[in-house]
């Protein structure tokens, strides 16, 4: 097992380039790391072990040994993990560069085999060509990669991943890219490497190669908010939660993601110079993204009390102290605007409910409560239009000239009063609301705080390093969420 890790340990003594590139944390002394129950493959050393979160992207893809070097596949520094990473789309030229990189860093020829045999025989009590002592020589060249599916692209991290484990809780899936290359050509490359090995090691090499090169591909799954660690989140002030990440940057810049790999094959001195100028740079990013909004909203809706719609409370829904209406939820754990949306929507729906439905008090149960909870859960999705239609018909609308109306004569506070007047572009608050007016107000209460069309789906911790540097230089890295407020909020100021 862990042939890739053993190969990095033994091959790092071959050349100066290997000495710089093949130094991984799994072959160094262990340092304390945050524990985790997630079992998977470390993308840096390829061994199957317990994973912890990466300091560069907050994903669980690094083991407790390799995390000490703080390397991420999104770094700007051309370390081994970065060189093994290819950005979609996959082409034959990119795969050919991966094969050449393996041949450059992990060569197998007569001199290499002789060197390892000599270094092994100088120790006693070792049988000739035992797999445990020549594990580095049976590292096959395969095109199996761990695919991390972001919104706009897929990152393929190539390596030799051994063993079996459940991939459902991992941020990546394994894909076999051999069909995009040439299966027969890859077989020929590995057969040439096997020819230099002793007969006993050839059997091990052939078995590993055919097992690894014939595995089926899994469908890459898009990242979700649960894939990102919450341990990199910090509270910054009363209203913002930010994420601290670290990326390795250098003085050298490349135009495309694969340029460092091409320079490794054509200009090794540039790679060595870039490795000498690397530094770890912190980035304090905002945590506003669509997946986090859905995650926080689902937690809030789980504790929501729709019976507030039947109450006479003066306080907002999030601050009321009532056995039936109070929300047992810590609002400091979610974005402050979600709390405002929850209060505004519940306040508006209560006015509609008290104007049309004969309900007793907040302690009474109503079939409408399930409809309200379902609508709150879909506030940020396209399904909200359908749930708004169901909500409107819960208020017993009356049809006049093929237009449905509900009453709206229950008192509202000045904030909602002024907002409805500006939303409907009218001079006074109407006593009846049509279906179009009802949905316009309901959608505007959500869009008042978020311009969902401008919010990215995933956290900025998965963004490329060059984009983080650009945002940091413009001063929009930590304060970028201010730019995502809707235009209606700007007009209010």
From Swiss-Prot:
The record's region (Interaction with host IRF3) falls at 319-493
Q: Which UniProt keywords apply?
A: Host cytoplasm, Host cytoskeleton, Host-virus interaction, Inhibition of host innate immune response by virus, Inhibition of host IRF3 by virus, Inhibition of host IRF7 by virus, Inhibition of host RLR pathway by virus, Interferon antiviral system evasion, Metal-binding, RNA-binding, Viral immunoevasion
List the record's Gene Ontology CC terms alphabetically.
host cell cytoplasm; host cytoskeleton
- Example GO molecular function term? metal ion binding
- Organism's domain of life? Viruses
Question: GO terms for biological process?
Answer: symbiont-mediated suppression of host cytoplasmic pattern recognition receptor signaling pathway via inhibition of IRF3 activity; symbiont-mediated suppression of host cytoplasmic pattern recognition receptor signaling pathway via inhibition of IRF7 activity
The primary location reported for this protein is host cell
Where are the annotated segments for Zinc-binding domain?
Answer: 42-79
What's its job? Answer: Plays a role in the inhibition of host innate immunity by inducing the degradation of key host factors required to activate interferon production such as IRF3, IRF5 or IRF7. Associates with components of cullin RING ligases (CRLs) including CUL1 or CUL3, which are essential multisubunit ubiquitination complexes, to modulate their activities.
The name under which this protein is listed is Non-structural protein 1
Originating species: Rotavirus A (isolate RVA/Mouse/Brazil/EHP/1981/G16P[20]) (RV-A)
Its organism's taxonomic lineage begins at: Viruses, Riboviria, Orthornavirae, Duplornaviricota, Resentoviricetes
